[in-house]
Amino acid sequence: MKIDLDLHIHSSFSPDSLVSPGEIIRIAKTRGLDGVAIADHNTVRGGITGLDLNPDPDFIVIPGAEYSTEYGHVVGLFLSEEIDVKGRKPQGHTLSPTLPFEDVVNAIHAQGGIAVLAHPFQSREWLPAHVFNGAVKVDAIEGFNSRAGTRAYPNANSLASRCSSEYGIPALGGSDAHLSWEIGRAYTRIDLGGVSEGDVCLRDSHSLVKEAILAGRVECAGKQTHRAVVPLTELVKAYKRKTYHRMPYFVLKLIVAMLGSVGLRIENAQRERANAKNPPQQQ
């Protein structure tokens, strides 16, 4: 039996999302997903709320949270309680922008959770090997994150997939959705082994899913999200924090992102027309 899960979604418990846990579940089901992981910034409250709200035995909700470390963001999956974050404020905002990598991974493992390195090459091209094979290491990596290519490094997902192969760690897929229309743009296909459909209540199958992920019985796939999601998310954050004076700046960034996309489409269309008029000569 194989199931498709979006393993990285933010709810309204994050400072930069307005989508409630209940709405996430409803949308994910309409898009054919078998489950989701709700992983908010610095808090597991959104995931636990979603877990409590889920009435469907054929749909799984995995509580999680996303933490900032010196080596990037780490998502903890299958969490049951908060990890102590110094300076935590409502909606996951924290006074401490980065936490020690080893402390975060150890705290996730102490709960029986899985530590996933999220969009590792979104803003860098290199990470030390011990993150993947040291005494304290992640269990998996996001091989496809729908937002990863919208920032500094367009090849972020290909670098992550290469890292998965090099170190032999599972590659997971997640949309990193902060907006409702992003849900399901990336997913992880998980092979539950010899389990047959109807033999198991998926809602209560956390241990089966966890076992399959750690065993590497996973595939990731998805589509990249439009780069405009970044300033849109920043607008949501400014609105929720009531820093309204910053909103015009993010509106300008949104316009620039949209114009850049239009310009790229025009350039591609012109290139296609030129190739149609002057097809390459065969040797």
PLM regions and their residue ranges:
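Charged catalytic cores and adjacent phosphate/nucleic-acid-binding surfaces used
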Residues: M1-L7, S11, P15, V19-R26, ...
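Active-site flanking residues adjacent to catalytic metal/cofactor-binding acidic residues
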Residues: L7, A39, A65, A118, ...
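Binuclear metal-dependent hydrolase catalytic cores centered on His/Asp/Glu-rich metal-binding motifs
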Residues: V74-I114
